[in-house]
């Protein structure tokens, strides 16, 4: 399935404003039922996912960090990325160009939680030759 113009308008409104189906329908001049059906089709096609997001800036015990990683064997990048993504509290994993192979976005409850993530969970993956951790001190409009 390839999204048409209306689908893209729906996707954009959901992405930027998290609008209700009724609000989107009113903005586009179509029925709420049509919006609901299109969102369902977009979800079924794996194009969109609807979920609740947290703002770590306003929640206690929420530490956002990025962990840059190098992998011993470049041919295993995708496999290692998928393995890392299975670890609890990992929000995303991306393959990079440049100094590091992967960047991991992780949300933990404390510095102790970050240490546990790096020393126990991430080290359990194997084949990781280097890590560098970047702790987020303040985010602007970051929802996870």
Named regions from a protein language model:
Residues 1-144:
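A compositional/biophysical signature of low hydrophobicity enriched in polar/charged and small residues
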